[in-house]
Protein backbone atom coordinates (compact mmCIF):
# COMPACT_ATOMS: atom_id res chain seq x y z
CA UNK A 1 0.00 0.00 0.00
CA UNK A 2 1.29 3.45 -0.93
CA UNK A 3 1.04 5.76 2.06
CA UNK A 4 -0.45 9.16 1.27
CA UNK A 5 0.81 12.44 2.68
CA UNK A 6 -1.36 15.24 4.01
CA UNK A 7 0.57 18.46 4.62
CA UNK A 8 -0.54 20.68 7.48
CA UNK A 9 0.08 24.34 6.60
CA UNK A 10 -1.01 25.91 9.92
CA UNK A 11 2.45 27.26 10.59
CA UNK A 12 2.54 29.21 7.36
CA UNK A 13 -0.33 31.12 8.95
CA UNK A 14 1.58 31.24 12.26
CA UNK A 15 4.36 33.11 10.47
CA UNK A 16 1.80 35.50 9.02
CA UNK A 17 0.33 36.10 12.47
CA UNK A 18 3.76 36.82 13.96
CA UNK A 19 3.74 40.21 12.25
CA UNK A 20 0.00 40.69 11.86
CA UNK A 21 0.59 40.72 8.11
CA UNK A 22 -1.42 39.43 5.17
CA UNK A 23 1.40 37.15 4.00
CA UNK A 24 2.61 34.46 3.63
CA UNK A 25 -0.69 33.20 2.25
CA UNK A 26 -1.68 29.60 3.12
CA UNK A 27 -3.30 29.41 -0.32
CA UNK A 28 0.11 29.76 -1.95
CA UNK A 29 1.52 27.09 0.37
CA UNK A 30 -1.32 24.76 -0.59
CA UNK A 31 -0.52 25.22 -4.27
CA UNK A 32 3.12 24.29 -3.71
CA UNK A 33 2.33 21.25 -1.54
CA UNK A 34 -0.27 19.85 -3.91
CA UNK A 35 2.06 20.51 -6.82
CA UNK A 36 4.66 18.34 -5.11
CA UNK A 37 2.23 15.46 -4.77
CA UNK A 38 0.62 15.96 -1.37
CA UNK A 39 -2.68 14.09 -1.28
CA UNK A 40 -4.44 16.89 0.56
CA UNK A 41 -3.95 19.99 2.66
CA UNK A 42 -4.57 19.93 6.41
CA UNK A 43 -5.63 23.05 8.31
CA UNK A 44 -6.71 23.41 11.94
CA UNK A 45 -9.22 26.18 12.56
CA UNK A 46 -8.89 26.84 16.27
CA UNK A 47 -11.41 28.62 18.43
CA UNK A 48 -8.95 31.45 19.08
CA UNK A 49 -8.06 31.76 15.37
CA UNK A 50 -4.37 31.95 16.32
CA UNK A 51 -3.19 31.03 12.84
CA UNK A 52 -5.70 29.75 10.29
CA UNK A 53 -8.68 32.09 9.81
CA UNK A 54 -12.20 31.52 8.51
CA UNK A 55 -11.27 33.30 5.27
CA UNK A 56 -8.44 30.83 4.74
CA UNK A 57 -10.90 27.94 4.95
CA UNK A 58 -13.19 29.67 2.47
CA UNK A 59 -10.38 30.37 0.00
CA UNK A 60 -8.83 26.91 0.28
CA UNK A 61 -12.12 25.04 -0.13
CA UNK A 62 -13.11 27.15 -3.14
CA UNK A 63 -9.73 26.85 -4.83
CA UNK A 64 -9.01 23.20 -4.06
CA UNK A 65 -12.32 21.35 -3.68
CA UNK A 66 -11.80 17.77 -2.61
CA UNK A 67 -8.32 18.50 -1.26
CA UNK A 68 -8.92 20.23 2.08
CA UNK A 69 -8.90 18.31 5.37
CA UNK A 70 -10.18 20.53 8.17
CA UNK A 71 -9.23 19.87 11.78
CA UNK A 72 -11.50 21.43 14.38
CA UNK A 73 -13.10 20.98 17.77
CA UNK A 74 -16.41 19.13 18.06
CA UNK A 75 -18.52 22.26 18.53
CA UNK A 76 -21.58 23.63 16.77
CA UNK A 77 -19.60 26.68 15.65
CA UNK A 78 -17.05 24.51 13.85
CA UNK A 79 -19.72 22.18 12.50
CA UNK A 80 -21.51 25.16 10.94
CA UNK A 81 -18.28 26.46 9.39
CA UNK A 82 -17.58 23.05 7.88
CA UNK A 83 -21.12 22.84 6.51
CA UNK A 84 -20.72 26.31 4.99
CA UNK A 85 -17.40 25.74 3.21
CA UNK A 86 -17.59 21.97 2.68
CA UNK A 87 -14.02 20.65 2.95
CA UNK A 88 -13.48 17.14 1.66
CA UNK A 89 -13.12 15.85 5.20
CA UNK A 90 -13.19 17.01 8.80
CA UNK A 91 -11.08 15.62 11.63
CA UNK A 92 -12.61 16.25 15.05
CA UNK A 93 -9.91 16.91 17.62
CA UNK A 94 -9.79 17.84 21.32
CA UNK A 95 -9.03 21.48 21.95
CA UNK A 96 -8.13 23.22 25.20
CA UNK A 97 -7.59 26.90 25.89
CA UNK A 98 -3.93 27.88 26.05
CA UNK A 99 -2.45 24.69 24.62
CA UNK A 100 0.43 25.10 22.18
CA UNK A 101 -0.65 22.08 20.19
CA UNK A 102 -3.09 19.19 20.45
CA UNK A 103 -1.88 16.94 23.26
CA UNK A 104 -3.75 13.70 22.69
CA UNK A 105 -6.81 12.01 21.28
CA UNK A 106 -10.49 12.69 21.84
CA UNK A 107 -12.16 11.61 25.05
CA UNK A 108 -15.00 9.41 23.81
CA UNK A 109 -16.88 9.20 27.10
CA UNK A 110 -20.68 9.08 27.01
CA UNK A 111 -21.28 12.84 26.83
CA UNK A 112 -18.63 13.44 24.19
CA UNK A 113 -19.63 10.31 22.28
CA UNK A 114 -23.18 11.56 21.79
CA UNK A 115 -22.02 15.00 20.65
CA UNK A 116 -19.39 13.60 18.29
CA UNK A 117 -21.84 11.09 16.83
CA UNK A 118 -24.35 13.87 16.15
CA UNK A 119 -21.79 16.12 14.47
CA UNK A 120 -20.51 13.17 12.45
CA UNK A 121 -24.00 12.45 11.15
CA UNK A 122 -24.63 16.10 10.29
CA UNK A 123 -21.39 16.46 8.36
CA UNK A 124 -21.79 13.19 6.50
CA UNK A 125 -25.30 14.20 5.45
CA UNK A 126 -23.65 16.94 3.36
CA UNK A 127 -21.05 14.64 1.84
CA UNK A 128 -18.19 15.50 4.20
CA UNK A 129 -16.09 12.57 5.40
CA UNK A 130 -15.41 12.49 9.13
CA UNK A 131 -12.23 11.51 10.93
CA UNK A 132 -11.66 11.23 14.67
CA UNK A 133 -8.29 11.98 16.25
CA UNK A 134 -7.85 9.24 18.84
CA UNK A 135 -5.21 7.61 21.01
CA UNK A 136 -3.94 4.26 19.67
CA UNK A 137 -5.91 1.86 21.86
CA UNK A 138 -8.35 -0.88 20.89
CA UNK A 139 -11.27 0.52 22.89
CA UNK A 140 -10.82 3.96 21.33
CA UNK A 141 -10.82 2.44 17.84
CA UNK A 142 -14.03 0.53 18.57
CA UNK A 143 -15.75 3.60 20.01
CA UNK A 144 -14.69 5.65 16.99
CA UNK A 145 -16.28 3.07 14.73
CA UNK A 146 -19.53 3.28 16.69
CA UNK A 147 -19.79 7.04 16.10
CA UNK A 148 -20.14 6.37 12.39
CA UNK A 149 -16.87 8.10 11.44
CA UNK A 150 -15.18 6.74 8.32
CA UNK A 151 -11.61 7.62 9.31
CA UNK A 152 -9.47 7.44 12.42
CA UNK A 153 -6.30 9.43 12.89
CA UNK A 154 -4.07 7.77 15.44
CA UNK A 155 -2.13 10.17 17.66
CA UNK A 156 1.59 9.63 17.20
CA UNK A 157 2.55 12.11 19.92
CA UNK A 158 3.72 9.51 22.48
CA UNK A 159 5.68 7.69 19.76
CA UNK A 160 7.30 10.92 18.56
CA UNK A 161 8.16 12.04 22.09
CA UNK A 162 9.48 8.68 23.35
CA UNK A 163 12.81 9.09 25.14
CA UNK A 164 14.12 5.56 24.65
CA UNK A 165 14.11 3.02 21.83
CA UNK A 166 12.21 0.62 24.08
CA UNK A 167 9.46 3.15 24.71
CA UNK A 168 9.32 4.11 21.06
CA UNK A 169 8.95 0.45 20.06
CA UNK A 170 6.13 -0.01 22.56
CA UNK A 171 4.31 3.03 21.15
CA UNK A 172 4.87 1.74 17.62
CA UNK A 173 3.31 -1.59 18.62
CA UNK A 174 0.23 0.25 19.90
CA UNK A 175 -0.01 2.11 16.60
CA UNK A 176 0.38 -1.13 14.66
CA UNK A 177 -2.31 -3.00 16.59
CA UNK A 178 -4.73 -0.07 16.45
CA UNK A 179 -4.20 0.43 12.73
CA UNK A 180 -4.85 -3.24 12.01
CA UNK A 181 -8.00 -3.22 14.13
CA UNK A 182 -9.19 -0.04 12.42
CA UNK A 183 -8.72 -1.61 9.00
CA UNK A 184 -10.52 -4.78 10.11
CA UNK A 185 -13.47 -2.63 11.22
CA UNK A 186 -13.59 -0.95 7.82
CA UNK A 187 -12.05 2.34 8.90
CA UNK A 188 -9.56 4.35 6.89
CA UNK A 189 -6.45 4.70 9.04
CA UNK A 190 -4.38 7.87 9.27
CA UNK A 191 -1.74 8.97 11.78
CA UNK A 192 -0.15 12.21 12.81
CA UNK A 193 1.31 14.47 15.48
CA UNK A 194 5.00 15.08 15.99
CA UNK A 195 6.16 13.03 13.02
CA UNK A 196 9.35 14.23 11.35
CA UNK A 197 11.99 13.17 8.85
CA UNK A 198 13.82 11.06 11.44
CA UNK A 199 10.91 9.07 12.89
CA UNK A 200 8.35 8.77 10.10
CA UNK A 201 9.59 5.67 8.27
CA UNK A 202 8.53 3.03 10.87
CA UNK A 203 5.01 4.50 11.02
CA UNK A 204 4.78 4.68 7.23
CA UNK A 205 5.70 1.00 7.10
CA UNK A 206 2.82 -0.15 9.30
CA UNK A 207 0.71 -2.64 7.39
CA UNK A 208 -2.65 -0.87 7.61
CA UNK A 209 -1.46 2.73 7.48
CA UNK A 210 -3.01 4.74 4.66
CA UNK A 211 -2.09 8.36 5.27
CA UNK A 212 0.23 10.46 7.40
CA UNK A 213 -0.57 14.07 8.29
CA UNK A 214 2.57 16.11 8.89
CA UNK A 215 3.05 19.83 9.24
CA UNK A 216 5.53 21.40 11.63
CA UNK A 217 8.53 19.35 10.49
CA UNK A 218 7.89 20.19 6.85
CA UNK A 219 7.34 23.90 7.42
CA UNK A 220 10.41 24.09 9.68
CA UNK A 221 12.63 22.43 7.07
CA UNK A 222 11.20 24.67 4.36
CA UNK A 223 12.81 27.68 6.05
CA UNK A 224 16.17 26.29 4.89
CA UNK A 225 15.32 24.25 1.79
CA UNK A 226 12.17 25.81 0.39
CA UNK A 227 8.69 24.33 0.70
CA UNK A 228 8.73 22.29 -2.50
CA UNK A 229 11.97 20.54 -1.53
CA UNK A 230 10.74 19.93 2.02
CA UNK A 231 7.54 18.28 0.78
CA UNK A 232 9.45 16.19 -1.76
CA UNK A 233 11.83 14.93 0.92
CA UNK A 234 8.93 13.91 3.16
CA UNK A 235 7.21 12.20 0.23
CA UNK A 236 10.34 10.13 -0.26
CA UNK A 237 10.45 9.29 3.46
CA UNK A 238 6.86 8.04 3.67
CA UNK A 239 7.46 5.82 0.64
CA UNK A 240 10.68 4.35 2.05
CA UNK A 241 10.48 0.65 2.85
CA UNK A 242 12.64 -1.43 5.15
UniProtKB/Swiss-Prot annotation:
Subcellular location: Cytoplasm
Catalytic activity: 3-amino-2-oxopropyl phosphate + 1-deoxy-D-xylulose 5-phosphate = pyridoxine 5'-phosphate + phosphate + 2 H2O + H(+)
Binding site for 3-amino-2-oxopropyl phosphate: 8, 19, 194, 215-216
Catalytic-site annotation from UniProt: 44 (proton acceptor), 71 (proton acceptor), 193 (proton donor)
GO BP terms, alphabetized: pyridoxine biosynthetic process
SUPFAM superfamilies: Pyridoxine 5'-phosphate synthase
EC number(s) recorded for this UniProt protein: 2.6.99.2
Annotated positions binding 1-deoxy-D-xylulose 5-phosphate: 10-11, 46, 51, 101
GO molecular function, one term: pyridoxine 5'-phosphate synthase activity
Pathway as given in its UniProt record: Cofactor biosynthesis; pyridoxine 5'-phosphate biosynthesis; pyridoxine 5'-phosphate from D-erythrose 4-phosphate: step 5/5
One GO cellular component, as annotated: cytosol
Residues annotated as site: Transition state stabilizer: 153
Source organism superkingdom: Bacteria
Keywords assigned by UniProt, alphabetized: Cytoplasm, Pyridoxine biosynthesis, Transferase
PANTHER family: PYRIDOXINE 5'-PHOSPHATE SYNTHASE
Family: Belongs to the PNP synthase family.
Subunit details: Homooctamer; tetramer of dimers.
UniProt xrefs under HAMAP family: PdxJ
NCBIfam families referenced in this protein's UniProt entry, alphabetically: pdxJ, PRK05265.1-3, PRK05265.1-5
Functional summary from the UniProt entry: Catalyzes the complicated ring closure reaction between the two acyclic compounds 1-deoxy-D-xylulose-5-phosphate (DXP) and 3-amino-2-oxopropyl phosphate (1-amino-acetone-3-phosphate or AAP) to form pyridoxine 5'-phosphate (PNP) and inorganic phosphate.
Protein name: Pyridoxine 5'-phosphate synthase
